[in-house]
Amino acid sequence: MLSHGAGLALWITLSLLQTGLAEPERCNFTLAESKASSHSVSIQWRILGSPCNFSLIYSSDTLGAALCPTFRIDNTTYGCNLQDLQAGTIYNFRIISLDEERTVVLQTDPLPPARFGVSKEKTTSTSLHVWWTPSSGKVTSYEVQLFDENNQKIQGVQIQESTSWNEYTFFNLTAGSKYNIAITAVSGGKRSFSVYTNGSTVPSPVKDIGISTKANSLLISWSHGSGNVERYRLMLMDKGILVHGGVVDKHATSYAFHGLTPGYLYNLTVMTEAAGLQNYRWKLVRTAPMEVSNLKVTNDGSLTSLKVKWQRPPGNVDSYNITLSHKGTIKESRVLAPWITETHFKELVPGRLYQVTVSCVSGELSAQKMAVGRTFPDKVANLEANNNGRMRSLVVSWSPPAGDWEQYRILLFNDSVVLLNITVGKEETQYVMDDTGLVPGRQYEVEVIVESGNLKNSERCQGRTVPLAVLQLRVKHANETSLSIMWQTPVAEWEKYIISLADRDLLLIHKSLSKDAKEFTFTDLVPGRKYMATVTSISGDLKNSSSVKGRTVPAQVTDLHVANQGMTSSLFTNWTQAQGDVEFYQVLLIHENVVIKNESISSETSRYSFHSLKSGSLYSVVVTTVSGGISSRQVVVEGRTVPSSVSGVTVNNSGRNDYLSVSWLLAPGDVDNYEVTLSHDGKVVQSLVIAKSVRECSFSSLTPGRLYTVTITTRSGKYENHSFSQERTVPDKVQGVSVSNSARSDYLRVSWVHATGDFDHYEVTIKNKNNFIQTKSIPKSENECVFVQLVPGRLYSVTVTTKSGQYEANEQGNGRTIPEPVKDLTLRNRSTEDLHVTWSGANGDVDQYEIQLLFNDMKVFPPFHLVNTATEYRFTSLTPGRQYKILVLTISGDVQQSAFIEGFTVPSAVKNIHISPNGATDSLTVNWTPGGGDVDSYTVSAFRHSQKVDSQTIPKHVFEHTFHRLEAGEQYQIMIASVSGSLKNQINVVGRTVPASVQGVIADNAYSSYSLIVSWQKAAGVAERYDILLLTENGILLRNTSEPATTKQHKFEDLTPGKKYKIQILTVSGGLFSKEAQTEGRTVPAAVTDLRITENSTRHLSFRWTASEGELSWYNIFLYNPDGNLQERAQVDPLVQSFSFQNLLQGRMYKMVIVTHSGELSNESFIFGRTVPASVSHLRGSNRNTTDSLWFNWSPASGDFDFYELILYNPNGTKKENWKDKDLTEWRFQGLVPGRKYVLWVVTHSGDLSNKVTAESRTAPSPPSLMSFADIANTSLAITWKGPPDWTDYNDFELQWLPRDALTVFNPYNNRKSEGRIVYGLRPGRSYQFNVKTVSGDSWKTYSKPIFGSVRTKPDKIQNLHCRPQNSTAIACSWIPPDSDFDGYSIECRKMDTQEVEFSRKLEKEKSLLNIMMLVPHKRYLVSIKVQSAGMTSEVVEDSTITMIDRPPPPPPHIRVNEKDVLISKSSINFTVNCSWFSDTNGAVKYFTVVVREADGSDELKPEQQHPLPSYLEYRHNASIRVYQTNYFASKCAENPNSNSKSFNIKLGAEMESLGGKCDPTQQKFCDGPLKPHTAYRISIRAFTQLFDEDLKEFTKPLYSDTFFSLPITTESEPLFGAIEGVSAGLFLIGMLVAVVALLICRQKVSHGRERPSARLSIRRDRPLSVHLNLGQKGNRKTSCPIKINQFEGHFMKLQADSNYLLSKEYEELKDVGRNQSCDIALLPENRGKNRYNNILPYDATRVKLSNVDDDPCSDYINASYIPGNNFRREYIVTQGPLPGTKDDFWKMVWEQNVHNIVMVTQCVEKGRVKCDHYWPADQDSLYYGDLILQMLSESVLPEWTIREFKICGEEQLDAHRLIRHFHYTVWPDHGVPETTQSLIQFVRTVRDYINRSPGAGPTVVHCSAGVGRTGTFIALDRILQQLDSKDSVDIYGAVHDLRLHRVHMVQTECQYVYLHQCVRDVLRARKLRSEQENPLFPIYENVNPEYHRDPVYSRH
């Protein structure tokens, strides 16, 4: 056979022969073109010359010669194309002709590997393993390169070609990082295109896993591994099943799992994820077990055992560890199985407290819970109650019990009533019962309870008390010969009394009395002798006695005398001694009812002398016999000392020439009157008799200059004394003094008219401002003089004095010298509108300067007057450029001198200058507005860098100029000068030209997706910087940056890929911007990222990617076969991020390329993927009812595969068996565990991919055993059993029951394998039968044989137990019966504080309401109810409530202080209060107070229901207060079981501590001060059931009741209550007579005394208003003036006589009433702004206090005062008209004071002045005033007044609202009165009617503007009208006087005072007219209209 080459040559030869041609031509050709690809070659050549024959032969090293078919392209060109060549191979081409052969060598391109990928199995955290299949064709080597995510080359390698398998591993990489790998095939000098794949290193696992465990949660912590991490995934597995999972970011180092099962073991996996790969670490973790619940330790009444029960906690429990300990010492410890829930401890100590700890153990963890329990205590032994001989006492003794106890509780019973309940310490073995209110002689029962914790055990015994003696044995009365005793009967049993009286050791009387006797009188006794009286109580053979000592009253002395023996300071007395027993004599010296001497004299003495007495005073000497502290009746005699003469006599002429006044110091002692005599030369000129209180007088019409003698005689009784003095009158003064300057500046002439009378000479003095200059003595015959060398312009005072002896008379005159003009008058400075002139001051005195400004001799301004020290003046607001004349006048008094000067103003500068470049780069235009005044022209100049560029002169009518040829962007200084003559005024401004724009702007992306580079050429002119703006294609600004003027480019980074941008450049110079230069540019679009395979199956591949950043237009997607052929392509929207290819071949590798397009730019990414082989089908498993075998079968897999792999898994994931084969369809597994679930995997393998099918099957389980029941409740119980052996598997148990009720089965352990269940929903009390089976499997279950058990439930508890108080001694309880079968209820009621059982009984099941009676008031009780059914008891249900508390029931009238059972002294009353007076039915009485009232004949039976009442200090310092209370003292009645026998001894007025103790004026508190002597008092006892809370804060509304007032009890008189009173009355009458005489003598004088009444608030008046006492006032000023109604009109006419003289005088007397009180709080700086007028302030004592805010001491202030009325001491509140800032305070006061009525008697605005702010809503919309909400409900407008109704409530108490009426009188002028009386009277009556219909309301608020004038008139009229309705007299003066004691200026004007009289007169007239005509006039004034008009003299003003 020929070779291929030889055959080709032969073929060519034969061809040539067949052509039959001659010798062929020679071929000349040249190679034109040659191309080569991987599998083809193309070659072309051209024939040069004539056509010829040729052939083309090609060959390679693996291929012999072959002919390449040629084809003709044109006449001279030929070619040959070869296909299906071997890649990478060198081919030799020969073009053969007959005479020439040309060789061409061509090589095909090599191909890359067909498959190139990353081997995940061999990839680690630091290495990446790549593999590829050999390329087809020839390859000499492969070049493999590794790139990071940013396509930066990391590593590269050249690997020689291998025929089988090619691979390479990159080391030292970063864990968790993505890499791109490129491979290129190299063959000779050619390289294939690169093939890419990507891969990732495995992330590093976490390190140092830490576990923090709790019962329901696990806290996992870890440390980061090396390399990159994207996230951590945590998985908590339970037997291969995911229980919980979570994903956290790469920075996290901890994670918490919640909701876990306590005590459970989990498999924890912490997985690190990065670059699509994972790595993990795992660890076994366990949650902490939970502690048991409902742990209870009970003793069941046992002394020596305890029972412990608990409920199993949820979760897993392995066992329980129970320990019993006492005080930290473990007594016993036990380990119990987890299904046990109770245990018992025995042989314990009685009464001991044990600690029981139950630990739940799960694995290595445990949870503890502790409870305590106590054994029942033992009883005491040998209990006895004995009498110790003491009254009201028993001694209880006993022997201690066995075991432990804490204390004893001792109860004392009187029958069934508990008298004593007390606790004593455990170390005690006896207790003495004292002060427990035991009744003597009575038998009691004692119970001793041993208490240990809350457990008790008791023992009882009986005992009896000793009888009691009588109580409060005292001497009731004693006189000179008799002694009466009285006592109170004790609470005891007795038969009679034995009465005895003894004198020292001698028994005088011994007598038996009946048991009802309470007093006895002993007679025929010796005066002043001491006796012992004894009362003995006899009861059977027992007795007890009580004794009291008493003394008879001693006898009085006789024949008492007193004398002064002519001395001024001594008295002498003597007497005859008294009969009977006398210890001493008490001698008192009394002066003006005050004891000034108190001496005790021996009984043997009968005389005494008094020294150092007051002269002229009348004294009373009292001698009293005293024996044993008892005084006899007093004997009184009077005597007087001689009066003293006066001293300090002063005679004064008072500067008068016809008058002398005489004054002296009052003579010491007492004086009746003085006689003053004036004499001259021994002749009496005048004589006056002066009252003793006056110490001065005067004499007039005397001769000037004469010497007089004054004699003052002191008289007292029949005695007198004398004093002398002399004095002279003042001489007369001159007349008509004249002073003249004669037009000279240094000269004055003085002249006068001669003085009358006698004088020595004249003295003339000239002075200036009290500085003497000259004094001249002038003979009495001359009448003028001259003064020279004086100061110019000075005012001089000239005094002409008449001299006569030591006295003189002055007359003054004034004169002034002429002033001089100013000096150095100069124009100092000038401006456009100012002239500044200065000068030097004129010589001499100058009063002021007057300066004038003239223009053309006309005054420009009015003259200006300057002080005399002024030396300059500036004229302003002048006209610029104008000439002015300035004139300066020197003025001294009424004379003046002048000087002047002339000057000009500066022309004004231009204004409103505006410079603008007008958008040009080379010019500036300036314009301006001319200034004021005249100007000739303007000069405009431009400067650049201080160099003048241009300057122009502009006519005065031109106001604009433009500068040209300037530089762009440059700053210029422009100067504009106003020119006026030689003066200029210029202004400099700055302007800048517009900068030029840059040129040649270009934007380039430099192949970047995130940046653009902008470049430009520099702008012309001056530039500071370039502002470069980056905008969107639509012109939206994205960035704004600046570059220095020297920069020519800028790079924008962090841009959006594929986005088109606009760029603008502005040149900036001095804040000006050039025109923008603009260009456009686009960034390269970004390729997609995170391109990945999301799903691959046997027939399709799904890809997903992350969208390209930035903007893009669309995606092109290509899918290539392994040979590079396109399989499929698609174009998708930019929003698409996934794509799938369907109907692919199984197991094939594909390449997917995605290209991103944006505009004209693009970018791409690619990835490889393979399909999955098919799996088997119909895989099934079956156990065939066996417990140890499983059978599986299936159908074969379709498609290609290599083999099957069978894997059987245990439940824990471990492999049980593993088999491999290709032709299997069934398999059996044997030797398996019963009940266990197995999983079979059948895996189909094909290449590196596989597919599997799984099936599950389970063996049958084993049955349970040993069923039991626990925790049996009413609707639930626990069932436990023993499960199958531990080595078997099972999942659950199935529980069934009969009857088939709808029950709920709960697994409390959260583990289905737990050997117990809790069943809910049971019918209480029902019997059930249960069976249990073992269950294996969840969906397909197998069951074991059942086991059975029966049980019955408890009855249910009651529902909605509600107990509420019925009254103070009963409560009611109701409930809903349980839905259960039951027999009845067991009910107990206990006291909460003592736990004593007060009530216990069984109740039928049909009842659900119970009343419990006979309880203690105001005690909290606990009611417990249990349901009972067939020996089963439900849970106890408890509720507590408190019995009611209320005011104590008012005692009956006979229960009060008995005036017969009191002991009385001059300052105290001793009486007894008994607990039985007040019942505790409505609650225990907690406190008492004593209410004391002066008896005044009123019919009030009980105290006013007001709290608190005034204190003792208020009562003593305010005469209008008649009632006071003592301090509160605690009641101990509730502590005494027999409280009716408890009594309190009260000594009122003795500074008793319990009543408040001694009074301290510095402390405002309740106290117990001494009572007034000889004063009748009525006493009431006030008892409180509620007064203070637990923090001793007083309740706002305490609960109390009062006894009836006692009958009047009169205190004893002072010792001089007999004769002294008579003498005092006589002296009082004499004094009054002397006062009347003195008043007639000095009737024109105003008394110097001023009242100082106390301003305490009055208690409710009980006396008629016509009766006023002068207590608390000095002098004899009246406080009331009651007028009988039938005499009123005549009285009013008398007051109106002589132009209202008497009425004005009466009103004037009220001027200073109350003004002595302090207003310190109102004057504080913080409070001044709260006063409308600074002279109308509230007194501190009567002001209204608001509640404090935020501890601000001034926040309680408001200008308001309490005012008393006829009914209450705080009947009104008077306030000012609210200010804008005090409206909130006003409404706060209304709210806090419980105000229901407001009276307003002013308009808000009067005569244009605001009198009161509008402080209420204008409409019916609600408004806030502070925290209060006010709403107007209605408004009734009448002609003269308006009535509004408001609703007010607190912001936090919207339901607790109050209605308030607002009475607004609208026709009353300020400081005046209404036109008629009818209008106001009717208004007052209307308001009073509303007030009377508002019971329980607080004070009525009344206000005008200041709150004194109209307000006072309204209140006074209201009180007066009430008097007219209820009394026969009216007291207007007293009403106003009372008002002014509480607020200043009440009834402010006299016309208002008269108006009140007119109102009374008109009311009385109308009443009389109504009576006559029987036509009702009041209150509606119908039919009759009398003239209710004011008198004309009091018209409005």
From Swiss-Prot:
PANTHER family attached to this UniProt entry: CYTOKINE RECEPTOR, RECEPTOR-TYPE TYROSINE-PROTEIN PHOSPHATASE BETA
Induction section of the entry: Up-regulated by hypoxia.
Gene Ontology terms: cellular component: plasma membrane; receptor complex; specific granule membrane; tertiary granule membrane
Residues in the Cytoplasmic compartment per record: 1643-1997
GO biological-process terms attached to the record: angiogenesis; dephosphorylation; glial cell migration; osteoblast differentiation; phosphate-containing compound metabolic process; protein dephosphorylation
The protein's name in its UniProt record: Receptor-type tyrosine-protein phosphatase beta
Record keyword Lyase present: no
Record-listed substrate binding positions: D1870, C1904, S1905, A1906, G1907, V1908, G1909, R1910, Q1948
Domain called Fibronectin type-III: residue spans: 23-111, 112-207, 203-288, 291-378, 379-471, 467-552, 556-641, 642-729, 730-829, 819-906, 909-1001, 995-1083, 1087-1175, 1173-1260, 1260-1356, 1357-1448, 1458-1554
InterPro entries on file: FN3_dom, FN3_sf, Ig-like_fold, Prot-tyrosine_phosphatase-like, PTP_cat, PTPRJ_TM, RTP_Phos/Ushers, Tyr_Pase_AS
GO molecular function, one term: transmembrane receptor protein tyrosine phosphatase activity
Assembly: Monomer. Interacts with TEK. Interacts via fibronectin type-III 17 domain with CDH5. Detected in a complex with CNTN1 and NRCAM. Interacts (phosphorylated form) with FYN and GRB2. Interacts with IGFBP2.
Main location: membrane
Membrane topology: Single-pass type I membrane protein
Pfam families (UniProt xref): fn3 (PF00041), PTP_tm (PF18861), Y_phosphatase (PF00102)
PROSITE patterns from the UniProt entry: FN3 (PS50853), TYR_PHOSPHATASE_1 (PS00383), TYR_PHOSPHATASE_2 (PS50056), TYR_PHOSPHATASE_PTP (PS50055)
Gene label: PTPRB
Reaction(s) this enzyme catalyzes, per UniProt: O-phospho-L-tyrosyl-[protein] + H2O = L-tyrosyl-[protein] + phosphate
Residues forming the catalytic site: C1904 (phosphocysteine intermediate)
Domain of life per record: Eukaryota
